[in-house]
Amino acid sequence: MKQVFLESHNLKNRFSGFGQFNYHLIKAMAHFPQDEFEIVLNAKNTSALKEEFGDTFKYRKYSSLTRHKPFRIKKKYNLWHCLNQNIKIEPFFNIPYLLTVHDVHFVKENSVEMQEKLKKQFKEKLQRSSAITYISEFAKQDTHAHFKVPDVPEYVIYNGNTITDITVPEDFKPSILPPKQYLFSIGDFSERKNFMSLVEMLRFLPEYNLVLAGNNTSSYAQKLTALVSQYGFKNRVFQTGKIADLKKQYYLKNCDAFVFPSHREGFGIPPIEAMRFGKPVFLSNNTSLPEIGGEHSFYWNNYNPEYMASQLKSGMEKFNNNKAFYQNWYTDRAKSFNWKNTAEKYLEVYKSLI
């Protein structure tokens, strides 16, 4: 039987965006057993995957050695799916190759030397590609703006919403709990996510606390913590670190609003997770966020803290004055991003390439 190889080693970090993408795509694909081909997963912990998915998939044990050219995987699969633009693991031979592009933010980030290295790596991926999928229209447009894209089939396939069912027990309480109403955001603590602008904004929102979830071990996190101390906000800004789904759902369910002032996104799953709870969503008006947020989310055009606070206050007033409409719109929009639909579209692309 024909085989489709999914380069899915990012499953090893479920807290990362790529890890989430890999896991939820594969989980959704499990609902569509294939007669025409087998799907092979490349993963470090194959036993956990076998326990969850059984013989729905085939499995290959990931080895970091395969990142290096002499040790590349030599099996000639009928299709190789590279699940993101940053992966260093490539097939040894020239075989049918599907590339999924989440973003090309690397053209604006990192040192000049690193930018050139990543551009070279990405150009090689483009030249390998038999087809390309993008997770948003913005990701496609941005790729075309910075690179010569080969004349191959291209598809925009949106990610799904990772939260479909709300499963927070009534008696559950996380260990970190603000004493009054709060705003919530989640993501890596990095310049790109721009969490410090939220701390600055709090100076003009004395009625709110702020909960920030995500990997907070970076140098940016240290700067943010210093800013919190500078303003005397230790009892107003709460950093949870990485959190599991239950805690994330709790904070989304109980926050007053979800705030996401990111500088750059290829898609933006956290906002649609917040929408599932009918929460007002405040986003940067840039990159993919207006595309994903839609017409009834609220947007910041700049990061002046007083302006951001004013936009939040006026947005909250609009939301509260027409709460039923906004809650219904948000939950409907969240449900429109469905991993089963996403998986079905990828499987159709596979069929077209093998």
Q: Where is each model-derived feature located?
A:
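Carbohydrate transferase catalytic cores enriched for Leloir-type hexosyltransferases
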Residues: 1-354
